[in-house]
């Protein structure tokens, strides 16, 4: 179907800009990504978070978490709730390891 084709072929990637301060239990619940209204991002949109990991000399991606957009701050920045993988995302980001956020077409109405 057309919806399946769009979901599979028109994803976009972005980066995590900054983590919000942790909650009272030390968990990072929100963060900022480098995509906003300019890319059509709106509240409720979903992103999968992957860590780039070398395996046998080849860069691969391993899923570490999921985000839901809470608020679009401006054309270039959105604030997201971490819905899965808060410890993994915080650890990788803090260590400077490569994290990539990939749009999840299911949330974009496709």
Walk through the language-model features, giving the residues of each.
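Surface-exposed, polar/charged interaction patches used for macromolecular assembly or partner binding
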Residues: 1-110
């Amino acid at each position: 179907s057309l919806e399946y084709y769009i979901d599979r072929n028109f994803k976009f990637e972005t980066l995590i800009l900054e983590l919000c301060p942790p909650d009272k239990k030390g968990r990072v619940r929100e963060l900022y990504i480098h995509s906003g209204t300019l890319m059509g991002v709106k509240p409720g949109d979903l992103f999968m978070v992957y860590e780039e990991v070398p395996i046998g000399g080849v860069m691969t991606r391993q899923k570490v978490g999921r985000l839901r957009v809470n608020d679009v701050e401006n054309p270039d920045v959105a604030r997201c709730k971490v819905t899965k993988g808060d410890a993994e995302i915080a650890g990788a980001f803090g260590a400077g390891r490569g994290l990539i956020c990939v749009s999840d077409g299911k949330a974009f109405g496709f």
